[in-house]
Amino acid sequence: MEINGISGVGMSTAFPLEKNTSSTSVADGAGKFFKELVGKVNDLSQQSDQAIQKLATGENRNLHETMIAVEKASVSFLFMSQVRNKALEAYQEVMRMPV
C-alpha cells in the first residue's frame, strides 16, 4: 500500500499574488492611503464651504442640504484625525519595542 502526502488545497490559485513591475513597500501603500484620505477630506471640506456660500447668497434655500454637507466634512475630518492618531500610536509602540 502506497502512502501519499496530502496534496495542496490550491491556495496559490485561490489568492494569487499581485505582479507589479515596480516594487512597492508597505510604507508606500500607507503613504498612498493617507494621501488619498487627506484628498477626500479636503474635497468634502471644499464642498461644505461651497454649500455655505450658496446658502448665504440665497442660491440654495435648503438648509438641511447645507447642514448635511457640513456634517459630512466634520465627520470625515474627525475620522482622519483618529486614523492619524492610531497610526502614530502604532509607530510609537513599534519604536518602544526592544531590539
Swiss-Prot record:
Compartment(s) where it occurs, according to its Swiss-Prot or TrEMBL record: Bacterial flagellum basal body
GO CC annotation terms, alphabetical: bacterial-type flagellum basal body
Keywords linked to the UniProt accession: Bacterial flagellum
Keyword Transit peptide recorded: no
Record-linked Pfam families: FliE
GO process annotations (BP): bacterial-type flagellum-dependent cell motility
GO molecular function: cytoskeletal motor activity; structural molecule activity
TM segment ranges: none
Record InterPro entries: FliE
Superkingdom assignment: Bacteria
Family: Belongs to the FliE family.
Record-given protein name: Flagellar hook-basal body complex protein FliE
